[in-house]
Amino acid sequence: MSSPAATSPAATSPAPDPAAGNRAPAPPRVGMFPPIGLLERGPETAGAFLAQVAGAGIDHICCGDHVSFLVGVGFDGLIQATALSMLHPALPIYSGVYLLPLRHPVLVARQLADIARLAPGRLIFGVGVGGEDRHEVSVCGVDPATRGLRMDECLAIVRQLLTGTPVTCHGTFFELDEALILPAPAAPIPIVIGGRSDAAIRRAGRLGDGWLGVWNSPRRFAAAVELAAQEAAAVGRPGPPSRHAMQVWCGLADSKEAARACLAPAMQAYYQLPFERFERYCPYGTADDVAEFLAPYANAGCAEFNLIPQSPDPDQAVAGAAAVKKLLARA
């Protein structure tokens, strides 16, 4: 390919099912993030937690990604995904989200192909440009103002490399001559594109299998689904992306007061901002309270929820997430 823009997403992502529009929508899938530091507690503890998650009927385990966030903390998302994949034989892993513009696309394609060999069909690759910490971007040698353009170029390169075909690229950011990654994954890796802006939603329409939202209303979510579909049609994709998702911090406990007491300090510590800045987008209370908050998003087209549950203990977080899934299936 002469430039990343030459890659057609229709050629590198699964074709939509023409009969899907005639079926009732499936209940939303529900995944969760593990407690912070789980992998550092050793394989026995981490493996037991993943077995508990899978046994509760939760659909996937999630992992984030940061290089040097706010005060310098981070944990590489694809290293986490690899470790998690080795600790359970079947549980899917959802990266939510990997900061793709901070990396070289050929190296990322190699990592993805290797994970596909170790855990076939189990990775959902959520990507984003990063928004909360511009300093994290700049210390990686990337101009924060170029993140969107770099994402477009990276996605086009990664998608084509994962098909096992050579890539020649004379782009704005990358020069490649017959780059090749083998063996290619036996099945396409779903790529879900995160971000709050219209630009991110359009990117999902052009290059993604779905959009991953955060901090938005059900009305905004429905508008995003429509905008992604319009963008997909504009670039000639055979159908709209449909793997739309929401990332949701939530508090799960026996009462609203107890749930908020878990959620608020956790979010303030992570983002270094007052909880009130996020509160209207973050449900807390019992599983019924959280499911009631999420149901309008499912009605707006959300197929997956990635919960970041905060509870008095990990067992209650798992049980609460599983209960939310069951309640949404009945909604």
What kind of feature is each model-predicted range?
Residues 1-331:
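Active-site-adjacent structural elements that line small-molecule/cofactor binding pockets in enzymes
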